[in-house]
């Protein structure tokens, strides 16, 4: 919670991993057998926040978690964990290879897709600051405040916040 005023010029909206693999039919989460209605629940609020951010000139940043097609940036323990739950990263699924850059499941869902001029960062890990230029983008744009939204709150959003 923040009790002060928000200066749009110094605030960025960071939309974390709203990807088909996490909240779309045939994606990674759907393939694991989870109810994607739960992962999609935050989309309407995020769409409204995006509309507000765009209208006020706030910097909008989107992230996508994914790995190179040859999986050379996929740590062994991450691959092992995904295989244990039956949806190994890189394996074929209804939305293409799971969490692989360039595949349909890696794309951001249409409801909150980036528009031209918005920052789009690709990351191989959970946090948006790991192996990306997010810090540089924030500093270059004079950003002092962040509004975070995304999927999965307990993993990627929380890791970015920390």
Please report, for each region that a protein language model flagged, where it lies by residue.
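Active-site acidic carboxylates
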Residues: 1-115
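Short glycine/serine/threonine-rich phosphate/pyrophosphate-binding segments
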Residues: 153-160
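Positions that flank functional sites
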Residues: 68, 128, 153
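Active-site-adjacent alpha-helix immediately C-terminal to a catalytic or transition-state-stabilizing loop
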Residues: 140, 161-162
